[in-house]
């Protein structure tokens, strides 16, 4: 089951949402989820999971990986046939995994992902969350076309939402929508958005604005924040944030794992 996370505008919160939902899903359900990124970014998934002062802290939980793996063994990639041929970081034990970026050269990463990881991803039978670049990445169009579910990150802005419907209507049948950095006191609240655009309530969720969450994520402590607040031990705002994150995760995973017969969103 391939789940592409994508946004139709800049700074829509794709990577942060993918990471938060991946963590919440494996804490809630007995799933195995592997995270992929189809583009190089210094602000990728690991930014939210590990403090920046510990750049090599992921060394111990890495499987099939050592420093320089891809540079030394790129010839193996041409003949690789499964995920066993690629490095995988175990983020949460027996639940959440991550395929790390293997070069800081954005063009090389784009090319290698398209040529070598896309064939593996096509055959991948478990749940894959894919941070999908908007724009001209070689693999982005293919990922969006072949994904079982496309998680569309939207800003809480009526113009931006309208822009999605005008320009990307082909994604609607497989889409699950998330309003990122959601402000519940905004005049453009979820009820108004649903009414204005006709969303089905089971196909849209929110990730609320939270200073504490943003602070934790910015310092690489998202795992700690979500794990600590998962059982509701934080402040009232923390509780509200986690309840909405859990609800959004539940709605998405219903579509991903429990409803294999993907129907029309509208």
PLM region spans:
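Walker A/P-loop phosphate-binding motif and the immediately C-terminal alpha-helix
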Residues: 2-48, 114-117, 121
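Conserved beta-strand segments of the P-loop GTPase G domain that flank and frequently precede/overlap
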Residues: 5-6, 36, 100-101, 129-131, ...
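P-loop/Walker-type NTP enzyme "switch/lid" segment
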Residues: 35-120
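Loop/turn-to-beta-strand initiation segments
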Residues: 94-96, 122-130, 149
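P-loop/Walker A phosphate-binding loop and immediately adjacent motor/lid segment at beta-alpha junctions
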Residues: 106-115, 164-187
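Inter-motif core of Ras-like GTPase G domains
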Residues: 137-157
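Beta-strand-loop-alpha "switch" segments that mediate conformational coupling across diverse proteins
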Residues: 181-183, 187-232
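NTP-binding/hydrolysis catalytic cores, primarily Walker-type P-loop NTPases
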Residues: 223-266
């Amino acid at each position: 089951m391939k789940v592409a996370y994508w946004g139709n505008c800049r700074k829509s919160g794709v990577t942060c949402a993918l990471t938060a939902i991946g963590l919440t899903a494996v804490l809630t359900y007995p799933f195995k989820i592997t995270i992929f990124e189809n583009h190089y970014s210094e602000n990728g998934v690991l930014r939210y999971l590990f403090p920046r002062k510990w750049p090599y802290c992921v060394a111990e939980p890495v499987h099939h990986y050592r420093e320089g793996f891809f540079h030394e063994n790129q010839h193996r990639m041409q003949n690789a046939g499964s995920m066993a041929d690629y490095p995988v970081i175990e983020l949460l034990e027996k639940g959440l995994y991550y395929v790390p970026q293997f070069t800081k050269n954005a063009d090389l990463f784009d090319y290698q992902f398209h040529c070598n990881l896309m064939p593996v991803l096509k055959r991948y039978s478990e749940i894959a969350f894919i941070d999908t670049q908007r724009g001209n990445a070689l693999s982005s169009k293919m990922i969006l076309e072949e994904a079982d579910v496309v998680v569309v990150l939207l800003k809480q802005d009526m113009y931006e939402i309208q822009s999605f419907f005008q320009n990307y209507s082909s994604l609607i049948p497989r889409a699950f929508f998330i309003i990122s950095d959601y402000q519940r006191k905004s005049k453009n609240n979820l009820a108004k958005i649903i009414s204005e655009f006709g969303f089905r309530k089971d196909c849209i969720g929110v990730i609320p604005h939270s200073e504490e969450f943003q602070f934790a994520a910015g310092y690489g402590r998202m795992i700690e924040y979500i794990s600590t607040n998962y059982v509701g031990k934080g402040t009232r705002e923390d509780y509200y944030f986690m309840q909405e994150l859990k609800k959004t995760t539940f709605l998405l995973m219903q579509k991903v794992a429990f409803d294999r017969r993907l129907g029309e969103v509208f």
